[in-house]
């Protein structure tokens, strides 16, 4: 049994070079065949990092750990939002923090505040990880203007959840009770009634073993995203060297994906135009991903939040 575990592959690479194959994967995942979360990226060469972290560190940032020191969340956030033309969002984040501090007597750091705003229905581009393959496909092509391959990362929840639960259990035994931020997020995860009006709501389900992950409309936002990526790294492998295997689309769809908690779908740039048509056909537009509605978080701040 131990040898089998050691021989198990960790990451698969699947190249998709036809729109027909892409449609098959879309149908496969949208039917719920496999418990995955997805991240779409405009460049297949990028590692699996959040948009915020990638902007801060460029391509020097490695998936297996960080080569940077600690910086205040506000510096990260301001720089990222300014570079992406979303400076107004930072003002809204500060306003949210002010309201939260007034109501609950706790000052949120900027990243936590940004994540909670999105949780309450406010559009945000801070992290584009989804339970929907099609939503990830949107992010893999949104604003793309280069002839480079895109990518969709798929993380198999079923395969990592058991070990993740053991990791968090050991951490709790070692460090005692979780801090107030984790307790707060757990509380918010139970507030399902705020999901009713938005188009991408999905239950938290198997992801509730990650205490700092917030689900909103099928999209995930993490106030401590670097912590999640690091814990995911430890979950997938006990050492920094991934075992990588390349497989065909047919092999994956026929069940060969079972030994791969992490899958990278490389989308050939040769099908870019056809993908654009597919997104239009599925009505996956900016307006649908980021609903152009009046933010609803103010009303939801009145929900009772406990720290017990």
Residues covered by each model-derived region:
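Catalytic-core elements of nucleic-acid end-processing and repair enzymes
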Residues: 1-308
């Amino acid at each position: 049994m131990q040898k089998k575990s050691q021989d198990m592959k960790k990451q698969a690479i699947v190249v998709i070079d036809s729109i027909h194959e892409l449609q098959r994967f879309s149908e496969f995942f949208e039917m719920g065949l496999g418990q995955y979360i997805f991240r779409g990226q405009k460049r297949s060469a990028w590692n699996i990092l959040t948009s915020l972290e990638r902007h801060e560190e460029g391509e020097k940032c490695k998936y297996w750990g960080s080569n940077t020191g600690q910086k205040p969340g506000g510096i990260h956030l301001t720089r990222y939002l300014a570079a992406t033309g979303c400076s107004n969002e930072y003002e809204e984040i500060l306003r949210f923090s002010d309201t939260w501090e007034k109501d609950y007597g706790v000052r949120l750091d900027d990243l936590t505040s940004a994540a909670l705003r999105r949780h309450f229905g406010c559009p945000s581009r801070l992290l584009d990880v989804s339970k929907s393959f099609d939503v990830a496909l949107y992010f893999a092509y949104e604003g793309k203007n280069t002839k480079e391959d895109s990518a969709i990362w798929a993380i198999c929840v079923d395969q990592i959840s058991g070990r993740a639960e053991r990791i968090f259990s050991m951490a709790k035994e070692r460090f005692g009770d979780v801090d107030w931020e984790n307790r707060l997020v757990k509380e918010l995860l139970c507030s399902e009634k705020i999901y009713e009006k938005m188009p991408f709501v999905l239950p938290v389900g198997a992801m509730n073993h990650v205490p700092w992950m917030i689900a909103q409309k099928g999209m995930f936002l993490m106030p401590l995203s670097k912590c999640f990526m690091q814990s995911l790294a430890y979950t997938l492998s006990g050492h920094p060297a991934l075992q990588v295997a390349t497989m065909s689309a047919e092999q994956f769809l026929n069940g060969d994906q079972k030994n791969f908690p992490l899958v990278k779908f490389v989308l050939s740039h040769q099908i870019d135009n056809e993908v654009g048509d597919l997104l239009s056909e599925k009505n996956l537009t900016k307006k649908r991903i980021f609903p152009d509605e009046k933010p609803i978080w103010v009303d939801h701040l009145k929900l009772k939040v406990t720290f017990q």
